[in-house]
Amino acid sequence: MAEAATPKIGSVGRVTQVIGAVVDVAFEGELPKILNALETSNNGNRLVLEVAQHLGENVVRTIAMDSSEGLVRGQEVADTGAPIMVPVGNETLGRIMNVIGEPVDEAGPLVTAHKRAIHQDAPSYVEQSTESQILVTGIKVVDLLAPYARGGKIGLFGGAGVGKTVLIMELINNVAKAHGGYSVFAGVGERTREGNDLYHEMIESNVNKHGGGEGSKAALVYGQMNEPPGARARVALTGLTVAEHFRDQGQDVLFFVDNIFRFTQAGSEVSALLGRIPSAVGYQPTLATDMGQMQERITTTTTGSITSVQAIYVPADDLTDPAPATSFAHLDATTVLSRSIAEKGIYPAVDPLDSTSRMLDPMVVGEEHYEVARKVQSTLQRYKALQDIIAILGMDELSEDDKIAVARARKIERFLSQPFFVAEVFTGSPGKLVALEDTIKGFKGLVNGEYDHLPEAAFYMVGSMEEAVEKAKKLAAA
């Protein structure tokens, strides 16, 4: 449990008003600074309050990080003299903690050598790295068509049951294998059941060990749907603080946020409780500032990088809603998961035509990679345009050129699938991590017609093109 700083003389106040998650505290002596953590006990538990406003007459308005039911007027509150401090370091791997750094996985206390404040400034311009580099994930469809920037921000869009969690776990696994990096997962305002499932799936698929310890690759920080808005508005910052520590140790860190919309939603609830006048669609007037302050901390420095994958819920599928629209401004790439692709049994169900990346630029990825990616997309686009004709008239009515394009597109679709390490438990087929050179070489051969003689089935759920050729031989022999 994080120790509280020893209260200073004159830094003990008393509760004067409790309205839901907002608690007013009067101090006689020195007032605590904005964003300082105050502590009191509530129903026998430690309750942390974060200072949000100075109201005058020695009263501060605070936001509770846990339920305020049971607080009474006149109750003593101590100023810790610092912002919320959370444990950071390798001891956090394989563990689940809450917004104030307390372990919630019933695996004993979380003791670390270092603690860090959740509010930090973004790295200065001098510390930031300006190089554009790809973070190779070993997932063909991502690396070829919508590559991730090292230290970039990626938006992950997808409905329920199309494989967001499996993709997230595979990314955690591959980054640990290929880059030796750790991952931090921040569960912001999502279902507790999903958080529980993710924890157990990580143990089953060897991403984490039970109770942490050697071999664990990810730290989990949860502030789920049932938490008060104060916790949901800050839990992403807690996760980010853990990730920043790993980055400053020279690591390439993956930072997952599920769901970034809930961060904004919690900020909106807190803003209303603090009495701020709402802005467009009822959101907080500080929406862009809140988002910017968090997103600017996610970056590459000269020592290491934080690459962030953020699941984004789009309310009522309205992309112009201020919450998703504000997050789009910060993204370098988007990975869109499609139900229609998942229905074909192609996993990962990434939509090759809808997913985008600013890294797909010949100046960054090189001329060959860019040309191959564009050819793959144009072949798939042509197939999409011909699907109506095929549905009405059948394949026989197509020209010879179109028939070849359709055959290649179907092979490309299947070759974009690949077996995942974390899904070995369910599929029985060993996972594949494909090098970028092999991915480019394989798809280059496909679009140039070098593999037109191989059957479609040979390309399904394989890693490199060599495996597809081997599979074709086995199919022919069968």
Swiss-Prot record:
Keywords, comma-separated and alphabetical: ATP synthesis, ATP-binding, Cell inner membrane, Cell membrane, CF(1), Hydrogen ion transport, Ion transport, Membrane, Nucleotide-binding, Translocase, Transport
Gene this chain is encoded by: atpD
Function: Produces ATP from ADP in the presence of a proton gradient across the membrane. The catalytic sites are hosted primarily by the beta subunits.
GO molecular function: ATP binding; ATP hydrolysis activity; proton-transporting ATP synthase activity, rotational mechanism
EC annotation from Swiss-Prot or TrEMBL: 7.1.2.2
Protein name per Swiss-Prot or TrEMBL: ATP synthase subunit beta
Subcellular location(s) per record: Cell inner membrane
Membrane association type: Peripheral membrane protein
Organism encoding this protein: Rhizobium johnstonii (strain DSM 114642 / LMG 32736 / 3841)
